[in-house]
Amino acid sequence: MTKLSKRQLDILTFIKEEVKSKGYPPSVREIGEAVGLASSSTVHGHLARLETKGLIRRDPTKPRAIEVLDEEELNIPKSAVMNVPVIGKVTAGLPITAVENVEEYFPLPETFAAPDEQVFMLEIMGESMIDAGILDKDYVIVRQQSTANNGDIVVAMTEEDEATVKRFYKEDTHFRLQPENPSMEPIILQNVSILGKVIGVFRNIH
């Protein structure tokens, strides 16, 4: 193995452990906390040296894009991660994961979905689901499906061709999309298109 300082080895080991346990790499802040470095610039310096040594690769445009290159030596299974499309907008008439809708891809553990299931992520805008623990700027992890049971949290397309995340209820004469915020009214629809069921939430802690 390329010669590393103790700090560099600690950082590389922490990245490896986070990828193996969570399926995606840690943030710079998390790395600093794990190895006892208060300065993010110092962490960036160590990451730059690891990159120079060919042990990691970074994408400076993304906060968590740290790829461990020495995977065989570090025993990181490539099959443990799937790249999930992050949807920037939902275009009526197009599949939810159409190229026109995808902003980027985010690594998640394959355990989030069965092999035959399709998963996407969507950024939450607003506070309509705060009582369900889904906050403004969170990303929901969504399993694609066109049906839902009463009480499921879903991504649905309204009659105005707008995507919304709400709790789903099918009632006698209509569908009710219920917010989880007592200050907001439900959306009542005669027709609704289900795009998927929310199965998880991802949040950046700043």
From Swiss-Prot:
Catalytic residues identified in the record: 128, 166
Keyword DNA repair part of the UniProt annotation: yes
One Pfam family cited in the UniProt record for this chain: LexA_DNA_bind
UniProt-annotated site: Cleavage, residues: 92-93
Gene3D superfamilies linked to this entry: Umud Fragment, subunit A, Winged helix-like DNA-binding domain superfamily/Winged helix DNA-binding domain
Disulfide links within the chain: none
GO biological process: DNA repair; DNA replication; negative regulation of DNA-templated transcription; proteolysis; SOS response
Record keywords, A-Z: Autocatalytic cleavage, DNA damage, DNA repair, DNA replication, DNA-binding, Hydrolase, Repressor, SOS response, Transcription, Transcription regulation
Function: Represses a number of genes involved in the response to DNA damage (SOS response), including recA and lexA. In the presence of single-stranded DNA, RecA interacts with LexA causing an autocatalytic cleavage which disrupts the DNA-binding part of LexA, leading to derepression of the SOS regulon and eventually DNA repair.
Quaternary data: Homodimer.
This protein's name: LexA repressor
Gene: lexA
